[in-house]
A protein has these predicted regions:
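Extracellular distal adhesion/interaction modules in secreted or cell-surface proteins
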Residues: 1-300
Length: 300
């Protein structure tokens, strides 16, 4: 096997050795993907009280992926993220802050929001989701919001026989969930804030027993702690979560979040210089119409 902590590519790759030469096809390899239904899942159902955007397969691969939003990320973006929040490193204090996305289109157009899976370094199989709210984020308000699962399984390492159901760059379009917990479709009105949660190592563990949920809204966390860091690579915003073990590297699971139109989501965060990359990928890094990345540090 070849192992890498490089985010955005498969973390564990099978190899062969012939005449002292190592051979490997560096491709995403998913585990079994038998379809399952929302009502009769044979492996993992969303915990009671959580909403879902559709059905998924037994490896946690959503049946509602948005292929139009799928993207191969440039080396420029991936190298920059890796250098800022490396595996086993220490995320700079200046970037540690709380950032939930707020929809605010200056022209008051219809806004759609999507999330793209980037990858991660975790050996945990965690579910990732979101919630919508308006105004001040009180603990009671966030507790009352309807939580929706986007990706039931964010595991990418094929470690400890855990399933792999996602490839880097795959995408889901979100739905606006109003204050009554009702799905209002894909158009988000101005003034709505979107928070995020990571249900740590929950996939295939029968609901929420023995797992910890980490939130991007500090008041929603039991200790009130800010677990997020944020920085900007040109117009590309990275958000990260620190886990319960507080190992400070903030890189376990990462996501790209953007809006259409792109002006509708524009958080104010510190800027870092992009990695130079190569001539053949710079145009990709700057022309794509995405607005941000979420990176979660889990509780593994």
């Amino acid at each position: 096997y070849i192992y890498t902590s490089y985010v955005g590519v498969p973390g564990l790759v099978r190899t062969t050795i012939t005449d002292n030469v190592i051979n490997a096809d560096i491709e995403w390899e998913l585990t079994n993907n038998t379809p399952e239904t929302r009502a009769a899942a044979v492996t993992w159902n969303a915990p009671n009280g959580f909403g879902v955007l559709g059905t998924w397969q037994t490896n946690g691969r959503p049946n509602y992926l948005n292929t139009e939003g799928e993207l191969k990320l440039s080396n420029t973006i991936l190298n920059t993220i890796r250098k800022v929040i490396p595996e086993g490193g220490n995320c700079p204090v200046d970037y540690r802050q709380s950032v939930d996305f707020e929809v605010n289109d200056p022209e008051k157009r219809d806004v759609e929001v999507s999330v793209r899976f980037i990858g991660g370094t975790s050996s945990a199989a965690s579910a990732f989701g979101y919630y919508c709210y308006r105004g001040e984020a009180t603990k009671a308000k966030i507790a009352a919001t309807k939580k929706y699962i986007i990706f039931p399984n964010t595991h990418t390492r094929d470690a400890k026989a855990k399933p792999v159901g996602l490839k880097g760059g795959e995408c889901v379009k979100l739905h606006y969930i109003d204050e009554n917990g009702v799905d209002q479709g894909t158009v988000f009105p101005n003034g709505v804030k979107i928070g995020w949660f990571l249900f740590n190592d929950s996939f295939k563990k029968n609901g929420n027993k023995g797992n910890i949920t980490l939130y991007s809204t500090p008041k929603a966390n039991s200790n009130g702690r800010t677990y997020t860091a944020a920085f900007r690579i040109n117009d590309f915003v990275v958000l990260s979560f620190e886990d319960y073990t507080i190992d400070q590297d903030y890189n376990d699971v990462q996501f790209n979040v953007w809006s259409n139109p792109i002006e509708a989501i524009a958080p104010e965060v510190p800027e870092v210089k992009p990695d130079p990359g190569t001539d053949d990928d710079r145009s990709v890094a700057y022309r794509m119409t995405y607005k941000g990345i979420l990176a979660f540090e889990d509780n593994w």
